[in-house]
Amino acid sequence: MHGVGAGNSRLRAQLVPQALRRLGEKTQVLGPESDDFIRTRLTHSLEVAQIGRALATNLGADPDVVETSCLSHDLGHPPYGHNGERALAEVAESCGGFEGNAQTLRILTRLEPKRTSPGGRPVGLNLTRATLDAVVKYPWEPGRGPTRPDGSTSPKFGVYDEDRDVFSWIRAGRGAERCIEAQMMDLADDIAYSVHDVEDGVVRGLIDASVLWDPAEQERVVADTTAWYGLADGAALGDALDRLLGEEAWPAHFEGTYTQLAAVKDLSSDLIGRFVSSVCEATIAAHGPGPLRRYAGDVVVPERTRAEIALLKGLAVTYVMLPRESEPRYYEQRTVLFDLVDALVENPRALEPHFFEAWKARDESGRLRVIVDQVASLTDQSARQWHSRLCGFLRN
């Protein structure tokens, strides 16, 4: 079974799979082709792991488990970031949908060719139960998530139907409760991309921090943050923006000089340190000095910190993500993935050998899942190469 002989001292050594290497060519917010400076899913994951390890060390959790969870958290993301995720969710609707976090679990426990069971069944990396549980960000099946403030059910989920057995073994009847290591991973992810996506946006000239003193721009950012992340407290977000604008190193008029680049990097480091410290202090105040492992407690995020993280994420939404959703490349990216799925349905022999082997053993619904697995495994660049080889010119 998963976890036999897979001690924590070996976890990082296990995590050199092709799925991790491929993250270097997958979109974070800006595509990897944008600039050498811009973060990819791989560099983002390394930064998340660093933050996660700091949280674990300070709170008495197993740092190897948390770090491995952080390195793993984006393995399931397809080409073209969230745009690609939405496209694959559409084409995979008849076989249970697509969700990057459910795909991550599938890679770790099935798809990554590292270990097999005594009967020859693929078991992925054969990680420990604690490590796999720490990767489960959404511990529920499709349609069974928590109810949101507007009364709808969260569209996120952590497992596909055909992976339910291993999911049940991992979760051991815990319901929707998350272990503290998974909470640390999730928070480390939030901290990393809230800070670093803004840093990337400023350096690339997509975020002009000087306009944020305009009350109309402030209202726009707060409204986008509230709408995108479902937050109701606009006043708290406004206060968070005021605090960020008061930072001495805030890049008010960024022109890319050495001094300004250094100041932006220092600001990122200061914000990350502040967020980690505030969370550790609040969590220790609530639960004592630890150690905090598995289900011994919850990570406590002070409201000020939560608002500042959300506001930074909102800046990336307003000035990077929303404008790019109307760009022609977004439609082109979706077309690439739609075309690839269609082409592989028509010609499954074009699948990589291990995917074709899995395809032959499945029924119709299962075969579509295998094709989606194949397409999701591609990088931004290899998706285009496959499209050129299998489909030719982009259709209108």
Q: Which sequence ranges carry the predicted segments?
A:
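Alpha-helical scaffolds flanking conserved acidic
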Residues: 8-9, 59-72, 126-135, 181-182, ...
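Sequence-structural signature of the catalytic-core scaffold of metal-dependent phosphohydrolases
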Residues: 1, 15-21, 25, 50-51, ...
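C-terminal functional modules
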Residues: 372-376, 380
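Alpha-helical phosphate/pyrophosphate-handling elements in metalloenzyme active cores
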Residues: 34-65
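C-terminal subdomains that position terminal phosphate/3'-OH groups for nucleotidyl transfer/ligation
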Residues: 226-366, 378, 390, 396
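Glycine- and acidic
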Residues: 31-37, 69, 174, 253-258, ...
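Glycine-/proline-rich flexible loop or hinge segments
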Residues: 25-40, 67-72, 87-90
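N-terminal amphipathic/basic leader segments beginning at the initiator methionine
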Residues: 1-9
